[in-house]
Swiss-Prot record:
Transmembrane segments: none
Keywords: Cytoplasm, Meiosis, Nucleus, Phosphoprotein
Cellular component terms (Gene Ontology): cell division site; cell tip; cytoplasm; cytosol; nucleus
Compositionally biased tracts (Polar residues): 170-189
Cited function: Has a role in meiosis.
Naturally occurring in which organism (per UniProt): Schizosaccharomyces pombe (strain 972 / ATCC 24843)
Gene it is expressed from: mug166
Protein name: Meiotically up-regulated gene 166 protein
Length: 234
């Protein structure tokens, strides 16, 4: 049995049907509404509404469109909540991975502080070696103060140039992030728990919205909500 979907056609009709084509915007399907022997299409709705007065037909269309929009808004809210949960769960997983990697890095970094630039006193041997090196500073003033210093570049790996971490200060990005309440693991877990409770609430609302559409479609044309709407207007 093909899955039936709610389809939106222009601004007038919305049908529950198994039809699916490229120029139709299919929405969330509801299996509980698709038990009829004949799929609900625009033609079927037209045939049914010919039994009603113009006012009854208009009331049915308005109630049907309203129920459809309400259902789709609840589905959209559910998707947004699920997306937020997924993002938070990914952030929590990345946090744990970053914290594990930073702990390993801190344990292996030597305690000696190394810097990218190293100062060396200017000597005659240093001057000779600098003049023969393509990466040296060869245009220094030879009449400069002999006590002055020059900067030499050494081939030191970049990761080893970082200063040793202070044992009393968190050195990793994850540790600094944990100090802020918004990105701490416990805060993310609390947010995830809250979002799951909202998901349960929205699912309950979706079930109620589906019941409204079920009443409009399966009990048509004697729908209780349709009869109430007919009596309350005009």
């Amino acid at each position: 049995m093909p899955r039936r979907a709610v389809l939106f056609r222009g601004n007038s009709f919305i049908s529950f049907s198994s039809i699916s084509s490229g120029n139709e915007s299919s929405a969330h399907g509801d299996a509980s509404l698709g038990q009829a022997d004949k799929p609900l299409t625009v033609d079927v709705l037209d045939a049914w509404t010919t039994q009603f007065t113009k006012k009854q037909t208009r009331v049915f269309h308005e109630a049907y469109v309203s129920a459809y929009i309400d259902l789709q808004q609840k589905y959209a809210r559910l998707e947004r909540l699920q997306e937020q949960i997924l993002n938070l769960e990914r952030s929590l997983l990345n946090y744990k991975s970053l914290k594990s990697n930073s702990t390993t890095t801190v344990a292996t970094v030597p305690s000696e502080k190394r810097y990218f630039f190293r100062r060396k006193p200017k000597t005659s041997s240093t001057t000779n070696s600098l003049s023969s090196s393509s990466s040296s500073v060869s245009h220094m003033n030879q009449d400069a103060n002999p006590n002055s210093t020059v900067l030499t570049f050494t081939a030191v790996p970049y990761d080893s140039c970082l200063p040793a971490p202070d044992r009393h200060t968190p050195s990793s990005a994850s540790s600094r992030a944990s100090e802020t309440g918004t990105t701490s693991p416990q805060s993310m877990r609390n947010q995830i728990s809250l979002l799951y409770s909202k998901v349960d609430q929205v699912k309950t609302e979706i079930a109620s919205a589906q019941a409204v559409m079920h009443d409009l479609l399966r009990t048509y044309p004697g729908s209780e909500s349709l009869q109430q709407s007919t009596h309350t207007q005009f």
